[in-house]
Amino acid sequence: MSQNPAHFSLLPALLILTALVTVAYWVSYFIGGDVRVVDARWYTAFESSFPIADAWLAVTAFISGIGLWRGTAWGPRAGLLAASALLYLAGMDITFDIENGLYALVPNSQPMQFELLINVWSAALGIVTLVVSWKRG
């Protein structure tokens, strides 16, 4: 990490954290259901279609976090993969939540509050990762 700017220490940590939280989310979703906003079939059908895509997100976030942390040449390239996965997830989730009126549940629903956090986190981290990786790569 010899010539990396200070934000390169934070970004890898956030990407690795994102990978770990993504795995924890799916464990909760399938085992306890605590993160489910509603139990209706239309909702679970949509959410249940994401584990493979989110696994890709977790893998690319973890790998890019390691690569950026170590200052490797491939770290920024992996960062572009992670950024695209984060932005795609944000776009899909935000569109679904708007079209189904789920943001109206935010004041009284902890799962929806967490969903909102995921939406903001994915969009913001996706943009930051894209910009940093593009400049670095």
Segments predicted by a language model, with ranges:
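Topology signature of small-to-medium multi-pass alpha-helical membrane proteins
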Residues: 1-137
